[in-house]
């Protein structure tokens, strides 16, 4: 089954990005699901690289890399990145700048869409 996760909340401001990534990882592991994730608004901050979190605390960068490593697709709203001054060099390798047209295509191709 193909899942699309749409993540609007910022990194570490709420646990929604964490829960989205956690569920995506579980679906990949237990059900071999095809995962696409689209981060927009403050959600794009979850894709910043070089995140420094305390030992024992979840790290969204590592979680996102795990989703990507299992062939997950991670897209980031380009307009949202620009509005926050986030340049491509500062995002997780494998996460890609994207557009609303790509989000529309991902939505059309998904069996299920989940929003966080």
Locate predicted features:
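A glycine-rich helix N-cap at a beta->alpha junction
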Residues: 53-80
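Short, glycine-rich nucleotide/cofactor-binding loops
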Residues: 5-18, 47-52
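Short, conserved active-site loops that position catalytic residues or coordinate cofactors/metal ions
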Residues: 38-48, 79-80
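Residues at the starts of beta-strands that form the adenosine-phosphate
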Residues: 2, 33-36, 73
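Histidine-anchored nucleotide/phosphate-binding helix
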Residues: 17-30, 35-37
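C-terminal structural segments of small proteins and small subunits
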Residues: 83-116
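Short glycine-enriched, charge-decorated loop/helix-capping segments at active-site entrances
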Residues: 50-55, 91-93
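Short, conserved beta-strand edge motifs with alternating hydrophobic and charged residues
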Residues: 5-6, 36-40
């Amino acid at each position: 089954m193909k899942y699309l996760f749409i993540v609007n909340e910022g990194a570490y401001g709420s646990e929604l990005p964490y829960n989205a990534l956690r569920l995506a990882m579980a679906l990949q592991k237990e059900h071999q699901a095809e995962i696409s994730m689209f981060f927009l608004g403050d959600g794009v901050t979850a894709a910043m690289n070089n995140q420094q979190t305390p030992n024992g605390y979840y790290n969204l960068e590592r979680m996102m890399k795990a989703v990507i490593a299992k062939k997950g697709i991670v897209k980031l709203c380009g307009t949202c990145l620009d509005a926050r001054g986030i340049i491509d060099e500062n995002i997780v390798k494998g996460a890609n700048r994207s557009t609303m047209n790509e989000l529309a295509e991902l939505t059309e191709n998904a069996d299920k869409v989940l929003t966080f």
